[in-house]
Amino acid sequence: MSEAYKNAGVDIEAGYEAVKRMKKHVERTKRLGVMGSLGGFGGMFDLSELSYQKPVLISGTDGVGTKLKLAFSMDKHDTIGVDAVAMCVNDVLAQGAEPLFFLDYLAVGKADPVKIEQIVQGVAEGCEQSGSALVGGETAEMPGLYTADEYDIAGFSVGVAEKDEIVTGEKIEEGHLLIGLSSSGLHSNGFSLVRKVLLDDAELDLDTTYEPFERPLGEELLEPTRIYVKPVLAAVKSGKIDGMAHVTGGGFIENIPRMLPEGLSAEIDHGSWPIPPIFSFLQEYGKLKEEDMFNVFNMGIGFVLAVKEEHLTDVIGTLESHGEKAYLIGRVKKGEGVTFGGAALS
């Protein structure tokens, strides 16, 4: 071990120990197609082992944003990896792709093997939920760039779809119906506003349980992002899904139009799904306007699917049989953007 490097703030031995601790978590994510083992210079995946005829690879990358600041404050790191996976796999899912493998990038101020293991444990959990193999990653110790207690995490997902079964949204027409899948809470967006409203302005305590919650505020805020892969793929296989949107940063206003062809808009039936209490809690403390809420947060709907009216019952049945809470939340009309009960929010 280099004492000079350690004196500069980089502990190579701690890094080795972290990798050793990761291995059991990586191992449980293995799936058909994975080649090699942890420690190579690149992760390998044999696409020919799968039954795709005209495979198209679909990739996505994302991070967790300032939700990490709450993990630091709570010293709770075992769910943030789920968020990193969810943000990526739900994106590739929106085009009908089956996630195949995942890589993570973890930058830390100080290599703490126990903390790193907790983070990677969450990544592995997210990979299991999505059917992804964790085939590689990078853990970089960066003293001077991050404090000893800080880190950042990003993820990279690669999925596959048959070329003629990719869901692009181009088949969506006026009259299509919109199905919303319930979120688990805030997911991984809007946390700069969350922290300003609840921590900076209201000075609430993360370890205190406030009405109407049954657990400390910090745990409520750190609830991991829901992963929609398995139920949605089951619905996609029916061939009845014409468009999908992952409701992330920008909320309904920015994300639903991304799946719509030009000249079409989404009319949302406000009140057609239950909005989790964390959102009214935030709105009350921050005195936030409704348009702010729908522009920033998922408001209880984390994923949206567009289907023809004649397919609605079948698709909802498939989703619910896989444990999803699915709601008819609106329809596609001529126009632009998103309206709520006929009133535009901007």
From Swiss-Prot:
Broad enzyme group: ligase
Pathway the protein contributes to: Purine metabolism; IMP biosynthesis via de novo pathway; 5-amino-1-(5-phospho-D-ribosyl)imidazole from N(2)-formyl-N(1)-(5-phospho-D-ribosyl)glycinamide: step 2/2
A Pfam family this chain is assigned to: AIRS
Subcellular location, principal: cytoplasm
Keyword annotations from UniProtKB, A to Z: ATP-binding, Cytoplasm, Ligase, Nucleotide-binding, Purine biosynthesis
One BP annotation, GO: purine nucleotide biosynthetic process
Family listed: Belongs to the AIR synthase family.
EC number: 6.3.3.1
Matches recorded under CDD domains: PurM (cd02196)
Catalysis: reaction(s): 2-formamido-N(1)-(5-O-phospho-beta-D-ribosyl)acetamidine + ATP = 5-amino-1-(5-phospho-beta-D-ribosyl)imidazole + ADP + phosphate + H(+)
Name of the protein described by the UniProt record: Phosphoribosylformylglycinamidine cyclo-ligase
Gene Ontology molecular function: ATP binding; phosphoribosylamine-glycine ligase activity; phosphoribosylformylglycinamidine cyclo-ligase activity
SUPFAM superfamilies: PurM C-terminal domain-like, PurM N-terminal domain-like
One cellular-component annotation, GO: cytosol
NCBIfam families tied to this protein: purM (TIGR00878)
Subcellular location: Cytoplasm
